[in-house]
UniProtKB/Swiss-Prot annotation:
E.C. number(s) listed in UniProt: 4.-.-.-
Organism encoding this protein: Thermosynechococcus vestitus (strain NIES-2133 / IAM M-273 / BP-1)
GO molecular function: deoxyhypusine monooxygenase activity; lyase activity
UniProt protein name: Phycocyanobilin lyase subunit beta
Keywords: Antenna complex, Lyase, Phycobilisome
Family assignment from sequence similarity: Belongs to the CpcE/RpcE/PecE family.
GO cellular component: phycobilisome
Subunit structure: CpcE and CpcF associate to form a lyase.
Record's function text: Required for the chromophorylation of the CpcA gene product.
Matches recorded under InterPro entries: ARM-like, ARM-type_fold, PBS_lyase_HEAT
Bilayer-spanning residue ranges: none
Length: 213
């Protein structure tokens, strides 16, 4: 058994929640793309601490994770799906866009909708080289954020504010900047929840500071 195989075996045979978490941490620390399938599998285990360790390990591996994770997103386990969407959002590769748009709009699990909504702002939009394609996809994302700004769940609306803040800071998203600012202004004034209003006000303050530096 190879060294990496031993780490994978330790994950697969862990006899307690704490042992599993430690085994996942050790596997993630190997920083090997060969560990990706095992780390993805851990997202579906009923062990939040181990899943969080797997999330961190997958994020550290970067773009190599995107294709296998998209192929293996769990349609039945919403907890695993939420972790997976968080990974995709943190990595930020636009190959995940269509999955994120669908999840943000229609996933039945609030945790998945929140994670996908935030991820629309953290995508690395500059990786879409064709400007007309990028602008069209940015408008798709903005339409979903506008829709989710009316969600009953305050946490989804909060995620909209976070996504708008990230989008507003991206040079690649300058084509929708005025629309982003307009939606931030609307939410900062009219959202019924003070936490959402405050988050949007923070984004606008950041914008104001950047304009004067």
């Amino acid at each position: 058994m190879s060294d990496l195989g031993a780490y994978i075996h330790a994950v697969e045979t862990a006899s307690s929640a704490s042992a599993l978490r430690e085994a996942v941490i050790q596997l993630a620390q190997q920083n090997s793309t060969a560990a990706i399938p095992t780390l993805i599998a851990v997202l579906g285990y009923n062990n939040p601490a181990a899943a969080q360790a797997a999330v961190e390990g997958l994020i550290a591996l970067g773009d190599a994770v995107v294709e296998p994770l998209l192929a293996q997103l769990d349609g039945y386990n919403y907890g695993a799906r939420a972790y997976g969407v968080r990974v995709l959002g943190s990595i930020g590769h636009p190959a995940a866009l269509q999955v994120l748009l669908a999840a943000a709009q229609s996933d039945f699990a609030p945790s998945v909708r929140r994670a996908a909504t935030k991820a629309l702002g953290t995508l690395r939009w500059q990786l879409i080289p064709e400007e007309t394609v990028r602008e069209a996809q940015l408008k798709e994302a903005l339409a979903v954020l506008q829709r989710n700004s009316k969600a009953a769940d305050w946490a989804v609306r909060y995620a909209v504010g976070v996504a708008l803040d990230y989008l507003h800071q991206q040079a690649a998203a300058r084509g929708i900047r005025e629309a982003v600012r307009s939606l931030l202004n609307h939410l900062s004034d009219r959202d019924p929840d003070i936490v959402v209003r405050s988050r949007c006000q923070l984004a606008l303050q950041r914008d104001s500071l950047s304009m004067h530096t």
